[in-house]
Amino acid sequence: MMRKNHPTSNSGSLHFLGLYPKPTLTAYPGPIMAPGESLNLRCQGPIYGMTFALIRLEDLEKSFYLKRPIKNEAYFFFRALKIHDAGHYLCFYYDGSYRGSLLSDILKIWVTGKRGGCCGTSVRG
């Protein structure tokens, strides 16, 4: 995954969030994982060719991750989860002019001693 400055920073900032429909964020194999397991977060939007970004709300002041799409979706892979990877995630996408989508619903990821089921659930704020 590629790290980028937070969108409120001066360089490379997103100018117009909310111009495109919000994407869907899902977790595979599920939102409840054990340390050391692999996790894929999929961000999917309706528009092809956009750049996708994943944000962990607990790390807003640090950065977010960028991915080039596979058609209209991007996968953010965590090879070996750690306890500190648990948290509230959301995603968005944007075009080459830094015009962005609405933010996805928040997806809560747990990293515990037990593993959960498929796909995850979004938390509506």
PLM feature spans:
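N-terminal Sec-dependent signal peptide, specifically the hydrophobic helical h-region
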Residues: 1-25, 48, 115-125
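N-terminal "mature ectodomain cap" immediately after the signal peptide
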Residues: 20-49, 54-56, 64-67
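A generic structural signal for short beta-strands and their flanking turns/coil linkers
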Residues: 21, 72-74, 105
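Extracellular beta-strand/loop-rich beta-sandwich domains predominantly from IgSF
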Residues: 28-33, 65-86, 94-99
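Intrinsically disordered, low-complexity regions enriched in proline, serine, glycine
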Residues: 36, 51-55, 63-65, 87, ...
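Structural signature of extracellular immunoglobulin-like
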Residues: 38-47, 52-60, 78-80, 85-96, ...
